[in-house]
């Protein structure tokens, strides 16, 4: 893969930034694509652009505002509360988001001569999003290959690891401090360690605390 090109689906968050560093390590050339779907915090797009610029990565922003029109949700509507009732999908779930994002990333990848697509989806997060499942990604990979007659490979470096292991991966890639200080995970739009209260911040902090304890224990 060292001689090939990849496109990373990139939001500027912890997971996708870790995947961006992973891709830089794996491929000869890397581009990033970010989707504007009228998300609650436009800062997400600015954050992604700043990270891509700092890393010298070509960055494309695609307008996906249609998604908000079709599937209103707590990630795009400030009048909707972020909730997660037991047995139900969180209010932050956006129907069709990863289906559309990966499909458009594939179209872009083919146009720029890349066959590798990297995304930070994983099954181990609390959310249970159906479009983060390995079976979905593998199914879509086959569909994209058939639809464009092109040998795409969708990579999911985080699929089977939890947040603590994601922090460990960023550390192994030499990007731990970068990811901690410059990424945006917080639903309230606070870069770095975030607000500490929203579900995304709580998940991120729990993983960070676990990893730091493990790292400290390993060094003793």
From Swiss-Prot:
GO MF term list: ATP binding; ligase activity, forming carbon-nitrogen bonds; zinc ion binding
Pathway: Purine metabolism; 7-cyano-7-deazaguanine biosynthesis
Enzyme category, top tier: ligase
The protein's name: 7-cyano-7-deazaguanine synthase
Binding site for Zn(2+): 186, 195, 198, 201
Enzyme Commission identifier(s): 6.3.4.20
Keyword Ligase: yes
Gene Ontology BP, a term: queuosine biosynthetic process
Catalytic reaction equation(s): 7-carboxy-7-deazaguanine + NH4(+) + ATP = 7-cyano-7-deazaguanine + ADP + phosphate + H2O + H(+)
Database matches in InterPro entries: QueC, Rossmann-like_a/b/a_fold
Coiled coil stretches, renumbered: none
Pfam families: QueC
Keywords: ATP-binding, Ligase, Metal-binding, Nucleotide-binding, Queuosine biosynthesis, Zinc
Known partners and oligomeric status: Homodimer.
Cofactor note as given: Binds 1 zinc ion per subunit.
Gene name of this polypeptide: queC
Keyword Ligase: yes
Job of this protein: Catalyzes the ATP-dependent conversion of 7-carboxy-7-deazaguanine (CDG) to 7-cyano-7-deazaguanine (preQ(0)).
Binding site residues for ATP: 10-20
Gene3D superfamilies, per the entry: HUPs
Cofactor(s) needed: Zn(2+)
């Amino acid at each position: 893969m060292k001689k090939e090109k990849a496109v990373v689906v990139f939001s500027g968050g912890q997971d996708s930034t870790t995947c961006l560093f992973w891709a830089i390590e794996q491929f000869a050339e890397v581009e990033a694509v970010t989707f504007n779907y009228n998300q609650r915090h436009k800062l997400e797009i600015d954050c992604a652009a700043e990270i891509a610029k700092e890393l010298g990565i070509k960055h494309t922003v695609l307008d996906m505002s249609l998604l908000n029109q079709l599937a209103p949700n707590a990630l795009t509507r400030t009048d909707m509360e972020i909730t997660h009732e037991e047995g139900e999908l969180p209010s932050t779930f956006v129907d069709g988001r990863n289906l559309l994002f990966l499909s458009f990333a594939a179209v872009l990848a083919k146009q720029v001569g890349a066959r590798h697509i990297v995304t930070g989806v994983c099954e181990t997060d609390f959310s249970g999003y159906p479009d983060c499942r390995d079976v979905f990604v593998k199914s879509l990979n086959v569909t994209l290959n058939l639809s464009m007659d092109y040998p795409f490979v969708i990579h999911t470096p985080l699929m089977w690891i939890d947040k603590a292991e994601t922090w460990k991966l960023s550390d192994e890639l030499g990007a731990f401090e970068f990811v901690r200080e410059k990424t945006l995970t917080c639903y309230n739009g606070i870069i770095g360690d975030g607000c500490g209260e929203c579900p995304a911040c709580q998940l991120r902090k729990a993983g960070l605390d676990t990893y730091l304890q493990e790292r400290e224990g390993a060094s003793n």
